[in-house]
């Protein structure tokens, strides 16, 4: 996959490093010449020095053949502009990092109107993850589905706990909330209970 990353801060460098390990063809764009040269030579990737929102800079980076452009500069507006230009110049998928709190309620609108594949707000994602963990502190794992309306939880039932030796039908009837136990794991055995 040919991926262009605009912005070589910590996030951009980490993305470039991790994605290059997966045999992707990575090109980075940043206006800091030394940073681009050092990073590109260290990881054997293509580096372009310039403004990532410039059409000519994106063309030099190979936007016409790119599958994906990820904009992670320090400016939300620059990230969005980079993605808009990439979408028009190369018709590739685009991902923008948007951190400004004022935009958080407008992320879906921004994503749809600009044709972005994804909008990432790292701070909001971290806060959501912390809130999920705090919501179910004894859960081993929490996955959320259906726009946060469904939580899939994994618990370890400890010996002599309230749930130990309790029948599944009793668990669902005695707990508050809408609960469906979809699987029980005992060692290597997975049991799917009948309703």
Model-derived features with residue positions:
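Cytosolic regulatory regions of ion transport systems
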Residues: 1-195
């Amino acid at each position: 996959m040919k991926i262009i990353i605009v912005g070589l801060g910590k996030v951009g460098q980490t993305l470039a490093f991790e994605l290059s390990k997966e045999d992707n063809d990575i090109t980075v764009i940043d206006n800091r010449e030394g940073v681009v040269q050092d990073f590109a030579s260290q990881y054997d990737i293509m580096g372009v020095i310039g403004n990532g929102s410039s059409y000519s800079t994106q063309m030099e980076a190979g936007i016409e053949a790119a599958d994906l452009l990820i904009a992670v500069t320090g400016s939300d507006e620059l990230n969005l502009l980079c993605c808009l230009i990439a979408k028009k110049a190369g018709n590739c998928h685009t991902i923008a990092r948007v951190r400004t709190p004022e935009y958080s309620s407008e992320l879906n609108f921004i994503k749809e109107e600009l044709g972005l594949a994804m909008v990432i707000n790292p701070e909001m994602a971290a806060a959501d993850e912390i809130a999920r963990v705090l919501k179910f502190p004894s859960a081993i794992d929490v996955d959320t589905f259906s726009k946060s309306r469904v939580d899939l939880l994994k618990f370890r039932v400890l010996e002599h706990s309230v749930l130990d030796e309790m029948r599944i039908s009793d668990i669902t009837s005695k707990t508050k909330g809408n609960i469906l136990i979809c699987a029980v794991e005992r060692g290597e055995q997975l049991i799917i209970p009948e309703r």
